[in-house]
Regions:
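Short beta-strand scaffold segments in enzyme catalytic cores
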Residues: 12-16, 135-140
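Phosphate/pyrophosphate-binding loops at sites that engage ATP/ADP/AMP, CoA/4′-phosphopantetheine
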Residues: 43-59, 205-215
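A short acidic, often aromatic-flanked loop/helix-cap motif at beta-alpha or helix-coil junctions
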Residues: 33-34, 92-96, 242-246
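Conserved phosphate-binding catalytic cores of ATP/NTP-utilizing and phosphoryl-transfer enzymes
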Residues: 93-126, 248-256
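ATP-binding/phosphotransfer module of carbohydrate and carboxylate kinases, centering on a glycine-rich
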Residues: 2-4, 30, 158-256
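Short beta-strand-loop/turn "lid" adjacent to the catalytic site in phosphate-handling enzymes
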Residues: 50-107, 143-149, 154-155, 183-194, ...
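Short glycine-aspartate micro-motif
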Residues: 2-6, 61, 126-130, 219
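Short glycine-rich, Thr/Ser-proximal phosphate-binding strand/loop in the N-terminal lobe
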Residues: 2-48, 55, 145-171, 175-176
Length: 256
């Protein structure tokens, strides 16, 4: 089995693959202060609850945007499974990831994994919208090259900023209201955050198409992808496993 871990600023997603089949997936809060022993207990417990055996893990891959946690996760994985983790980046993804980009080393691991999976699953050109702490848009051109993209504050990040600085604004559920014109404070905030996010993505995607000179399939991933997709006119498909799938493909090639 392959253990794939996507360490984000807010959430960490853990996936277990048997061949190319995803056997289990968990989404947990990212704890920046967690030590290796704590992390080992976390995923050992998850494996046990799912009836999976850690001793069957033969390889592992990590995509991390939290540098201080990368080593802790790698140590936890090694202690629990005896495997040394492949760390995802533009170099370790070579052969699957071709970048027309001034400095490929600065491309985040999650963006690399998303681009690898999108190109493999959907062909080129393709655009990925990843809804996380940041909303990332990745552009793969018709030649299959990663061209760059957009990084913007994520839905929850924007909402937190609004609630923090607006003393009289209530904390709300991140769902769209029944209509764009809110008839109370909660609906008005939901309209601004959720419908505003969908329109922001649509506007940016159209600008990307204009710059490329052609359109592309648009794939959404991340925690709020399914919610935003309902109100977007440019998103074609939601694939919540995209980042993990990219890690699997990169690891499969590396361990071949």
């Amino acid at each position: 089995m392959l253990l794939a871990i996507d360490i984000g600023n807010t959430h960490t997603v853990i996936g277990v693959y048997a061949g190319d089949s995803l056997r289990a997936m968990w989404r947990i809060a990212t704890n920046r202060k967690a030590a290796a022993d704590e992390l080992r207990i976390v995923f050992s417990t998850l494996f046990s609850l799912e009836g999976l055996d850690l001793r069957q893990v033969r390889a592992s891959a990590v995509a991390s945007v939290v540098p201080q946690l990368t080593r802790a996760w790698m140590q936890a994985i090694e202690d629990a499974t005896g495997t040394l983790s492949l760390v995802c980046n533009a170099e370790t993804a070579a052969g699957l990831f071709d970048a027309d980009y001034p400095n490929p080393r600065e491309i985040g691991a999650d963006r690399v994994a998303d681009a690898v999976a999108a190109r493999a699953l959907y062909g080129a050109p393709v655009v990925v919208v990843d809804f996380g702490t940041a909303t990332n848009i990745e552009v793969i051109d018709r030649d299959g090259r990663f061209r760059g993209g957009v990084i913007a504050p994520g839905v929850q990040t924007s909402a937190n900023a609004l609630f923090t600085h607006g003393a009289q604004l209530p904390d709300i559920a991140l769902v769209a209201p029944p209509a764009v014109i809110g008839t109370n404070t909660v609906e008005a905030i939901q309209s601004g955050i959720m419908l505003g996010e969908a329109d922001r993505v649509d506007g940016l995607v159209r600008r990307i198409f204009d710059q490329l000179g052609y359109s592309a399939k648009v794939i959404a991933t991340g925690g709020l992808a399914a919610v935003v997709e309902r109100y977007s006119s440019t998103i074609d498909e939601v694939n919540t496993e995209l980042t993990l799938e990219g890690l699997r493909l990169i690891a499969d090639r590396a361990y071949r």
